[in-house]
Design a protein with these regions (language model features):
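Penicillin-recognizing serine hydrolase domain
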Residues: 1-131
Length: 131
């Protein structure tokens, strides 16, 4: 992760690029480089079992066909809301990491819709749509 700068402990305020986040998720969730099998399973469970209000971004569109383990981050800054979603998608002939970073000058709700739309486009591009 050569292009990531952590200015505070709050996930939404990291300065990074999608490639770095994807490398991190891949290292933690889909290989033995960081976590052994048991710990990786726990991390996947924790990142998959989130409250419904936080099931957006990489989680969208909701589908029973695939397993998604993701982390979303968001927060207000003077020039707009930052909304990040990164995670691992597996099942139904899929196995990939997706990271989406955004800035919304129109607020959280607009940013969340935009991130969901980008996720939907990416999921569809990776294979047949999930709907």
């Amino acid at each position: 992760m050569t292009k990531t700068q952590v200015d505070s402990g709050w996930w939404g305020f990291w300065r990074t690029v999608p490639g770095d986040l994807s490398l991190m998720v891949d290292a933690v969730l889909s290989s033995d480089r960081v976590l052994d099998g048991g710990r990786r399973t726990i991390a996947r469970m924790l990142m998959a079992d989130v409250v419904p209000q936080q099931r957006w971004g990489v989680f969208a569109p909701e589908s029973r066909k695939v397993h998604v383990a993701a982390k979303n981050g968001w927060g207000p800054l003077p020039d707009g809301y930052r909304l990040n979603s990164t995670g691992w998608v597996s099942g139904a002939d899929r196995d990939y990491v997706l990271s989406i970073l955004s800035r919304s000058t129109a607020g959280f709700s607009h940013g969340r819709r935009t991130v969901n739309e980008v996720a939907d486009i990416c999921h569809s591009a990776m294979a047949d749509g999930l709907a």
